[in-house]
UniProtKB/Swiss-Prot annotation:
It comes from the Bacteria. Its EC number is 6.1.1.7. GO terms for biological process: alanyl-tRNA aminoacylation. It catalyses: tRNA(Ala) + L-alanine + ATP = L-alanyl-tRNA(Ala) + AMP + diphosphate. Zn(2+) binds at H563, H567, C665, H669. This is Alanine--tRNA ligase. Binds 1 zinc ion per subunit.
Amino acid sequence: MYTGNQLRDMFLNFFASKGHRILPSASLIPKDDPTLLLTVAGMVPFKPYFMRKVEPPFPRATTSQKCVRTPDLEVVGKTARHHTFFEMLGNFSFGDYFKAEAIPWAWEFVTEVLKLPIDQLWITVHPEDEEAKNLWIEKTGVSPERIKYDPENLWAAGPVGPCGYCSEIYVDLGESRGCGKPDCALGCDCDRFLEIWNLVFMQYNRDEAGLLTPLPKQNIDTGMGLERIASVMQGAASNFDTDLFLPIINKVAELSGIPYHDSPKNDVAMKVVADHTRAVSFMLSDGIRPGSEGRGYVLRRILRRAIRYARLLGIDKPFLEQIFLIIQKDYSHHYPELKENENFILNHLRLEEKNFQATLEQGTQILQDKVKTLQEAGETMLSGADAFYLYETYGFPVELTEEMLIEQGMSVDMETFNAAAEEHRRLAKEQSQQMKAVQESAAISEKAKALGTTPFLGYHELAAHTKVEALFRDGEEVKDAAEGDEVLIFLRESPFYAESGGQISDSGVIRSLRAEAKLIEVKKGVTGTVYHRFLLTQGVLHTGDEVEALVDEHLRLATARHHSATHLLQAALRAVLGEHVQQAGSLVTPDRLRFDFTHFSALTSAELQRVEDLLNEAVLANMPVAAEEMSLDAAKASGATALFGEKYGDTVRVVSMGDYSLELCGGTHIRATGDIGLVKIISEGGIGAGLRRIEAVAGAEALKYMRSLNDQILDAAQLLKAQPSDLLKRIQGLLVQVKDLEKEVQQLNAKVAKSEVESLLQQVKDVEGVPVLAAKVSAQDMDTLRNTADLLKDKMKDGVLVLGAAVEGKVNWVTVVTPVGLRGLHAGQIIKEVAKITGGGGGGRPDMAQAGGKDAAKLGEALDQVPAIIKSHIK
């Protein structure tokens, strides 16, 4: 019996013998592919080769590619084959060989290497792909009766991009695995016939409209799921019963104290925990961090689902670390990133688990209260607003809300949830400012491909004589552009730095004999072509014009200071906090720097001061700054720091600052650290779980910042009539006075409330035998309003209180029902209806609830409605 590791090696070595280069798995983060959040298939890393956007460096390749897919998340663990993370074995041809070679090689591997019986194998082809059918018969000797047509045999990795007809190999697992129906055959929905290999004949490109156009060259892309073929070769009932999963499942069983195969329900939970923890481990190992959007949200959702199912097994203590160590042991020989990034993975697992346990407990309690309320009202659907409140306020995933409600025979109103979420996104989008992205039309893309890489002169020159190779306006190529036009320009070579690695693009101008244009932004495409966006400020510019390209030297130098300071900052952070610190993002501009990094607690004042001291000591040392190109292997051997999760080419640029800092970097820098001048940290804070952010200023901007602080101190001293040296003592004295005055105000408010109580008690009305007091009171905040309610409650003993207070045009509401459950009355339900009249909402417990309203003008109207509202709720 072959192990999963042996099967992986057998596949790769077989295709190496056929002239394929064995490549390591690409990252789960697709490179330069905005159409995909995650790597979902083996061919994804090779899409630029299939599309010929980049010339393939080799004609053939074979990989075992890490993949993550989540559309079928809810059925993972309930079927034999569905997973979130899986390994896709594949062989690829980039315009080299095609069907005539791919088909017999696949047959050779399946029948001669794996030695699967021919009489158990079946083939499918597309009805319009007679060529493939004939090749199966001619090249392998497969009987025509064992080849079936399948109109679904058209494959693609996404909605747009390379695609083609495909041919699939199935294995018949035997009648014992089937449905037992007399007509059970290939195509039946049962588990008898298992697809083990998909051969994709990549011939077309599908666009946004669904139109297919032939690719420049024909390609081969095949995919064999390692987990599936392992289940076949090991005679396992499911993928989960192979050696790829059993060690993980056995650990889950050990932690839960429940044997595997104890019950179908527990088995599903164990499989979910094993599958999801494996997926999370690999996603973290590639630098994906848990977050609230994009692939970070996918990771967090999978992780939280694992924790939820572990709790169903009785595992209520942290466990993810123990499961990860099993995964690391079994997989790190082929995926060393699981070992190399162990600290990063474990830190995030611990933090996410800790945070979600608290979220789960809090959110579950709130949801249970809402379920109880629904049950009491005879309803089965939770409002989308309530579900969004759980998600937005407590981070409680709506998917988890849905699952927990399904267990209670209930559901979520997803239409109103999505509406609330969309409104939230709309508001967030309005509040954010995003840089205008380069919009590539097909014509622009083709031109970029034809021009290829744009030589960058800006490391050594800030002015260059170059030529306008092409002009585009509104996505269309034009021969000339006039004053006022905004255009995209391709230059023969460029001194302008293209936005990359967190450093913003250069500013500057180009000048010809007849025109001048101001640079707006610079970006680099996947082909290495540099896109320049200019605004024509004078004259007419033509394609073919010779121009002078001039970088804004002042802004370039200011940016370089901040970029070099960022390198020193990372080195200082690692020295003070530890080697676990890794860059998670950055922004480098002429006036500031922003550095995001991994660390799991706020920096103390002493740590922050030490980091700043080390930074400026490195500046004062005036160390030389040098850049050198070398192979990626040589850079790694030198100990150069790389951006975690980033995929680099074979040749990289390494920037050194004396013996203090060594990083892979393509940005621009000063010549010596002394050129930075001064670095001042202006803020440090958290931006997410396990992520911190430091903002700092350097050079002239640091001086400007320090002057501003000094001016504020002098202004404050003058305002408080104190010397700057006495300012702190003066402020402390004022704070004591303010605290004393606030105490006096509270005491006065309490006296006012007490004096109001007696007169308010005279307003109590009888509503079908229930004492009801609905009144407007003069409370300036919610605390005072609650105190007034408490005083009235003590006096009334039993009944209902509904108190409203107008504060700056809005309304605060408090409702009390005493004793709890009086005549079936629920304070939260009452206040919800009352507050609605004033344009607000709220809720709370059966005995006490509070709410807000937007329109104080309707306070009286709302109070008038209280008796009728209470009457409608009396049971």
